[in-house]
Amino acid sequence: MSVKIIIPSLGESVTEATIAKWYKKLGDSVKTDELLLEIETEKVTLEVNAPCNGTIEKIAKTDGANVTVGEEIGEINEVVDTDTACTNNNSYKKQAIVQHDSEQIVDKPASSSNILAPSVQKLVTENKLDPNNIKGTGRGGRITKCDVLETINTTPVTIETPALNKTNEERTQRVRMSRLRKTIAQRLKDSQNTAAILTTFNEIDMSKVIALRNQYKEEFEKKHTVKLGFMSFFVKATIEALKLIPSINAEIDGDDLLYKNYYDIGVAVGTDQGLVVPVVRDADKMGFADVEQAIGDLAKKAREGKLSMSDLSGGTFSISNGGVYGSLLSTPIINPPQSGILGLHKTEERAVVIDGKIEIRPMMYIALSYDHRIIDGKEGVSFLVKIKNLIENPEKLLLNL
């Protein structure tokens, strides 16, 4: 009996994907829930597993092919196993993964024919390692990412000197863009082509908020079991500024302006695969600890590739913190259909004039990129001034002033 291999549901509003890699060939034997292939959507990578025991008898779509939900991409000649019944053909086990996922583990292969799970296999392949020479410290001798990294760190590096007669073509590498990278590229270009993007800047004296955090961070963490960072201050300040300037929390819908009376704040997170912007829902109803916890949880899921489409969809305004990478100044690009994005940057000590005297203060540049079709320059400037005043006087945030 032939069982079809079909593309499973990919989440709300997602209908297309790209086959990243098949891990089985025609004629290969497979077991129920064994990894068959990886597919990439706009935001995440998913595993498609075998619906039953059997042999691969047909592969209709190969690596790099675009596919749609419900499309047949192959067939398995089912072999009935008395110990393992065939699973329902429509109930594929899916798991979002990310390159070099620290939680991905695999059985240590007994021979070269064994196939490693995608994230570990990629790390092993990129570093030209033999998995048989890697000692697994996981349960049952399984190999974890840490085992691979330990092997890399303890293996001498040999640097090859390129031959002088090599052509430029031989010294280049062509790699197909992932669906996530293509989506990022397309959305950023669409944003620039559609919106009338303008960026305005201001700077913030971080002295008071740094002092406040230093004074209460240990007590805060002890009570709430989450660290007190600066992002919660900026999220709360941003919400107050959005309430003051509602057009920045709105979007253009055809010939109408859609004003949103809720505050779902997207927080940009960099991952190995690219930038994602998970959303903190109803952030205006959260306390500082709730905001910090939500951001921490979403960032962890992003790095592990476990974000769902619901984590990424929607959002009324976004915040991007290039300061964590050392950025001093930037012009962030709007995440459509939103109308604005706040860019945070590195805090560094600079000489500033305070009451006619030069003092050294920890200063941060902030930037607001906004759609000038819906937001006037005065509104953009007022938005940043509001954030500046709240961060420089954090007691106003705490007292809701």
Swiss-Prot record:
Signal peptide: none annotated. Residues 2-77 form the Lipoyl-binding domain. Its EC number is 2.3.1.61. GO terms for cellular component: cytosol; oxoglutarate dehydrogenase complex. The active site is at residues 372, 376. Binds 1 lipoyl cofactor covalently. Its cofactor is (R)-lipoate. It is an enzyme of class 2 (transferase). GO terms for biological process: L-lysine catabolic process to acetyl-CoA via saccharopine; tricarboxylic acid cycle. One of its GO terms (molecular function) is dihydrolipoyllysine-residue succinyltransferase activity. Residues 115-152 form the Peripheral subunit-binding (PSBD) domain. InterPro entries: 2-oxoA_DH_lipoyl-BS, 2-oxoacid_dehydrogenase, 2-oxoacid_DH_actylTfrase, Biotin_lipoyl, CAT-like_dom_sf, E3-bd_dom_sf, PSBD, Single_hybrid_motif. Pfam families: 2-oxoacid_dh, Biotin_lipoyl, E3_binding. The modification N6-lipoyllysine is found at residue 43. PROSITE patterns: BIOTINYL_LIPOYL (PS50968), LIPOYL (PS00189), PSBD (PS51826). Pathway: Amino-acid degradation; L-lysine degradation via saccharopine pathway; glutaryl-CoA from L-lysine: step 6/6. It catalyses: N(6)-[(R)-dihydrolipoyl]-L-lysyl-[protein] + succinyl-CoA = N(6)-[(R)-S(8)-succinyldihydrolipoyl]-L-lysyl-[protein] + CoA. Forms a 24-polypeptide structural core with octahedral symmetry. Part of the 2-oxoglutarate dehydrogenase (OGDH) complex composed of E1 (2-oxoglutarate dehydrogenase), E2 (dihydrolipoamide succinyltransferase) and E3 (dihydrolipoamide dehydrogenase); the complex contains multiple copies of the three enzymatic components (E1, E2 and E3). Belongs to the 2-oxoacid dehydrogenase family. PANTHER family: DIHYDROLIPOYLLYSINE-RESIDUE SUCCINYLTRANSFERASE COMPONENT OF 2-OXOGLUTARATE DEHYDROGENASE COMPLEX, MITOCHONDRIAL, DIHYDROLIPOYLLYSINE-RESIDUE SUCCINYLTRANSFERASE COMPONENT OF 2-OXOGLUTARATE DEHYDROGENASE COMPLEX, MITOCHONDRIAL-RELATED. E2 component of the 2-oxoglutarate dehydrogenase (OGDH) complex which catalyzes the second step in the conversion of 2-oxoglutarate to succinyl-CoA and CO(2). This is Dihydrolipoyllysine-residue succinyltransferase component of 2-oxoglutarate dehydrogenase complex.
